Amino acid sequence: MLIKNAKAFLNGSFQENTDLLIKDGKIAEIGTALTAECENVVDLKGDVLLPGFVDVHIHAFMGKDTMNGEEAVRHMSRELKKFGVAAFLPTTMSASPEDTCKALDGIRAVMEAPEADGATVLGAHMEAPFLNEGKAGAQPKQFFVLPTEENWQRYTGGNEPIVRMITMAPEKEGALDFITRLTNSGITVSIGHTGADAETVHAAADHGANHITHTFNAQTPLNHRSPGVPGAAMVDERIACEFISDGIHLHPDICRLIMRCKGKELAVAITDAMEAAGMPDGKYQLGGQDVFVKEGAARLEDGTLAGSTLTMIRAFQNLMKFGATPEEAATMTTSTPAKSVGNHEYGVIKIGAPAVFARFTPEYEFVETIG
């Protein structure tokens, strides 16, 4: 494939009249006025070309949930690619060890035999079971346990190698030492669903934690005398901050605060999507609980927010609406999420990178996925 006349996001800026030669699913050449013997030549006529989005926190999409196993993850892979996503971390939630292992088995199966035309599964994000009962949010807290090696083995069932990230409450007994154990194994530890104070957040970072799960949601709040999780995260340069830019989970000013404090390299746009994402309002499920979606907001019967219906397309557009430049919004939805979980292959347009792109009009309306 030869892509012509793109306004491509390269090396942190948009470069017009860019051509890309694609061979065997990878970017083989980047330049201007490229020529090649190709059956498939796509002239973008100045449209914007982003690397495919990377979503490191997504539970479900278009009616299928990670917890339902392999076929659900395959469905997510296929459908997410249509929405401009190149790679993602299927995200588990609080459940029994048996159900958690089933979900991880499904993720592993898709990693071992990927969908031919789907977004790449980079690994699993485990959002449980080492969480704080007082900050459960929509997570069933009856399955929360202490972070011990025995519990880790019960909940992973031999699937540790495919776990890319885990959300933990660092104030739990034994958590700091276990953070060290996990990070030494190459797993990104994210602080979330937590009642930790600022000092505990910094201590967790000392032990290797470098990520915050859906910043400001399901954690201690920001206060001028007790800065809590978000206050510590804003000033700790070791920590990347996930945030849900749907205008529901966070006020736009809070999104602006995160972007201003963390910058485009440490502000990680996520969807935290549940199965209603890409679907109309109605009644859905999350972790066996009824979720009611009205005007795009997903809530349990008691009003608790239960994931989002956000897509990465809308996240990118909202970031610009909330004050980010197109370059900043592109970075926060592509390379920054990828790097936050140790991946430097996705989220960039460079020679050798996977050739999956999100095409937008010059006004940043989504057109199609290319690749």
Regions found by a protein language model. Name each.
Residues 153, 157-279:
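Active-site core of metal-dependent hydrolases
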Residues 57, 126, 182, 212, ...:
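Conserved, mostly hydrophobic/aromatic
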Residues 79-89, 133-160, 203-215, 226-240, ...:
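Active-site gating loops and adjacent loop-to-helix segments of metal-dependent hydrolytic enzymes
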Residues 59, 74-103, 119-132, 159-171, ...:
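Divalent metal-dependent hydrolysis catalytic cores, especially in the metallo-beta-lactamase
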Residues 1-36, 369:
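N-terminal metal-binding scaffold of metallo-dependent hydrolase/deaminase domains
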Residues 59-71, 138-145, 190-192:
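Active-site mouth loops of central-metabolism enzymes
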Residues 232-241, 247, 259-271, 276-360:
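His/Asp/Glu-enriched, well-ordered alpha-helical/loop segment
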